[in-house]
Amino acid sequence: MFINQIGGYRMQTDLIQELTEDEMPLFPLEVVLFPGGVLPLHIFEQRYRLMIQYCLDNDRLFGIVLIKKGREVGEHAEPYLVGTAVKIIEVDQLEDGRMNLITLGQHRFKITKIRRDLPYLVGQVRALEADDTEPPEDAEMPGVRAIQLYRTYESLLAELSPQWKVVEEIPTALDHLSYQIATRLQIPLTDKQQLIETVSIHQLLGREIELLERENRRLKISLLARRSFEKHDTNISPWKNASLN
């Protein structure tokens, strides 16, 4: 049996090959990625170099999962159980062994069991795909409403933050729309995790409509406050020509 040692990790090479079709290498991070999302990654830890090399050699996906407890670097972190499988679409392998990757979110999954006998986590997973991606005849309004609120949200953010780039294309397919909205929403990661765990696309879109309505109200208040402040010419401050001497 060939023993491979990489960066201090000694392991049986043939053990890695025993991953079944329903097993997936896991990468716990401080990020929630949705299907269709692009995620650049810089791989420097030896265990994840090993994981990425395995995925490249075997044409395998790996899973991006939000950290529930622990840190990205060091000991195995405890992940949330729902994440997104990603495909490596571009890789730049550096001379010192580090890698720069571009990954693309493929589909959601749920972890049913975690293996901890390898340098990196491996999850036994099942696909978490909604069966209501096509709206019934009486359910078109949520998509229309979501797009209206989403456009307003993007415009408000762009006005408040010049560095914010308004999205150019908004999909009309409900699943793609809901994933894009979830990606763009500037909300806490735990709130995003709740979104990714919502299996039904209609329920996900309904939750996003609530969030967009809330965030739009908040952004409008911030914008009104800024405009009100800007109306007052600071040059007429009574302290302008005052001297402390």
Predicted segments — roles?
Residues 2-245:
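N-terminal low-complexity, acidic/polar interaction/targeting segments
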